[in-house]
Regions:
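Nucleotide-activated chemistry modules centered on ATP-dependent adenylation/adenylyltransferase
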Residues: 1-208
């Protein structure tokens, strides 16, 4: 696969802890990790079939094959079992002007749920659209940065910051005293991405 290995490790550990905590507390919650069909993976297309790698501005076949299609397939399977589904997304308008436009275009005044663009009986709920980045991190880092299922939100914040917060920096202290604004604006992409000239998040991991 092509995910950043450090981020992948964190997400797999989090997924296992969510499922374990849910089982222990007898909650009907299960974390699922979705994969693309083996024939649609990046290396199968590029090395196996000779596909040219994605390049800007518009040649971006990877997102649909590696992310969108597998998720849509999973959603459709859930609908077959349950009749309908609500998809929660963590998108925010403050991420970028393009993201803000995209969210606004899909919003329906007076409704919390928006119909999915392509899938019947699927609805999208975006609970964080108006919330600032610093408030998201403030919430995640409360309770000493430990999530209800036992993962470290400080570690997650460290990944987004590109620095180790375990030694000299007290993130929770900064939040409580309002001394330093929380940023954590990094974005993680595929380590082999050919759409960007420089992968800053990957470089920060190398520097560490």
């Amino acid at each position: 696969m092509v995910e950043n290995p450090i981020v992948k490790k964190y997400m797999h550990e989090s997924s296992e802890k969510i499922s374990s905590a849910s089982k222990a507390q007898k909650l009907n919650i299960q974390a699922e990790i979705i994969y693309p069909d083996i024939h649609q993976t990046f290396w199968a297309r590029v090395i196996g079939l000779g596909y040219p790698t994605p390049e800007p501005p518009g040649f971006r076949w990877c997102t649909e094959r590696l992310k969108i299609n597998p998720m849509n397939k999973f959603v459709e399977e859930c609908i077959k079992t349950n009749g309908e589904i609500i998809i929660l997304l963590g998108v925010r308008k403050a991420e970028s002007a393009a993201r803000s436009r995209s969210i606004s275009e899909k919003e329906i005044a007076g409704y919390l749920l928006n119909p999915h663009n392509n899938i019947n009986n699927a609805y999208v709920y975006n609970p964080l659209t108006e919330i600032e980045n610093s408030l998201v991190w403030e919430y995640l880092l409360k309770d000493n940065g430990i999530s209800p299922w036992g993962t470290s939100m400080k570690q997650l914040f460290s990944l987004y910051q590109g620095e180790d917060l375990s030694e000299e920096q007290s993130v929770l202290g900064e939040i409580d005293e309002k001394k330093i604004p929380i940023t954590g604006n990094s974005r993680f992409g595929c380590w082999c991405c050919t759409l960007v000239k420089e992968d800053k998040s990957l470089q920060s991991f190398i520097n560490k």
